[in-house]
Amino acid sequence: MKFKLIIFIIIIYIIKILKSEILNEFGYGLVDENLKCLSFIGDSNNQQLCNNKLINKQLIYSTINKSNQIQSLKMVEQSFKQLTFLQGKCLNLNFAQFGICDIYFPSCVETSFGISLPKRLCKSVCKQIVTDCPTLGVSLNCSDSNKFPTIGTLYNLTKYGYTENNGFYQVECSNPTNYYYNEINSTNNQFIEICPSPLVLRNQSDSKYGEDKGYTYLSPTNCVLGCPQPFFKNNKWVQMYKMSIVLSTLSFICSIYNIITFGLLSKLKSKYNLCITFFSVSTVLMSLMDIVTYGIGYEELLCPESGRYAIQSDVACGVTGAFFHIGITTGVLWWTTMSICLYSEVKRFKMISFRYIIIFNSVISLILLIIPLSGQAFMSGNGSLGCWIRKTWYANGTFWIPCGISLFIGAICIVLVIYEIFKISRNLSKDNKPLMFQIRPFLCVLLVGGSFLYLFIFYFNNERNLDKYKAAIPSYVQCLLSSDENGEDCLTDGPGFGAYFTFYFFTRLFGITSFSIYGTSKIARDIWFESAYNHPFFNPYIVKCLSLLGISKHFSSNSISGSNQKRFNRNGSNFNMKQNKSNPNDSISLSVVESTKKQDTENELESNIETKENRSTDISIENTTSSKDSNTNSF
């Protein structure tokens, strides 16, 4: 008898344990009389979400006005954005999307008591999602049986007259697995990628959206970076746009002035005049890029469509990029030529015929232009103010390496010139006038060369840090995913604004620098005065004004044309113009000093060096230091 009693107690205990275990497989839910079984509100017009991922779209647990569905759509969209950037890290993310849609839009059961109850996602489905993508385990707590029951959810409907199972109404859990595998091959049920603003979704498997078309994809997603790339906030980009067009316009005007002065009006075509003219032509071409870009619109030209930067096949980009490249390449070559000419004058060795230098610089510039053009290397890039070469090997091979070589040659010439000038100054006099005579050419060579050197250093420093910038992209994406301002407060890692601003500042300063040094010189003013005097329209007015003012003015043969000398004497209204014979091979000196009276003549010495092809000019360093050696070249 006792044995039977023990057996009975054990059976009762086991039943209680089993019942307890069974009950543990259920979750408990609250009843909300305000929620009903209604149809799915549907996806928004421009974004597919759960429309094809719900088991039963006609019975969704929802408020009467469906306001909770609107909020749920926002939550699903945010979840899909995060899943987009988990590609490559997780398996079967499409299945996770089915599960997420089921969580936010649970299926609904209508009871005979007029109460609507939701179906919760099965724990097995939750565990499968987390197993495929452990990262989601942070937001999905599969051990919570109230949210993810193993069998179903129990709802207490006692007060509604339900008496079975002690008043607990059982609703089985939702398992979309079978539905998922039935729909997996449907074209409407593929994994949905959503890119957070300002990233743009493109299909990179489509050739028209390939990277070579101007798209920068954030692998392994189909999201592309915005254009321009958010290195800085919008107001900073506006500052750079304004700086760019203002400096480029001024540089363009200054360069045109130099071309007219030293290339067209000046009667003497010396090598320094030619260097200044060709260098000014190069800065005109560089400035045209910004002027054309501004005319079209910076963002319109550089970013022709959302998420795409301009490439060479975009005509405006190809043309402006070619202008800028041949301009800056030619500028580097002519700067180097000026450095070599400066050194040749100091050392007094004869250079090759200048026509060969012109041919050499022109041919090299064209070759360095044709190579990137043939490789479709011109593009605006994600963060730039204009189109230029963006492919690394083309950029290095057709500009930066030649630029480095030119900078090296020019730097050597500068150092040697400084050494020679100091040596001459020390040997001839304690006076520093020989050095002061070279102030303008030194300024030109040093300032322009220093600008090119900064560009060189900035570029390669930027290239060196590219991996660091790329490594910071995930942080930028994470910022976008958590941003409440459409990503406007998020920035990618890149060059500092100051360094970036300075880089573009220097590339637009060359024309202004050249004008400040040469265009404002005494000789430039005299060239314009002589040209105006020789013009039949202006001549009578100039003669009359000089006569009325009683001005005596003298044009040195070395300071203007090298072939004539004009003297204006104070003789009331009488005006004399006196020809002075001089060797036609005499060259114009671009070194400027103040005029000094010597008997009847005022000799003007410009601060640029001018070579003599066959014999010395009338003014020399020895003249300055009272030496009588007439064969010494002028500095």
Curated annotation (Swiss-Prot):
Q: List the disulfide bonds.
A: 37-108, 50-101
Q: Report TM segments.
A: 245-265, 276-296, 315-335, 357-377, 399-419, 441-461, 497-517
Which ranges are annotated Polar residues under compositional bias? 559-594
CC annotations in GO: membrane
UniProt main location, coarse? membrane
Q: Which CDD domains match?
A: CRD_FZ
Q: What is this protein called?
A: Frizzled and smoothened-like protein C
Q: Which organism is it from?
A: Dictyostelium discoideum
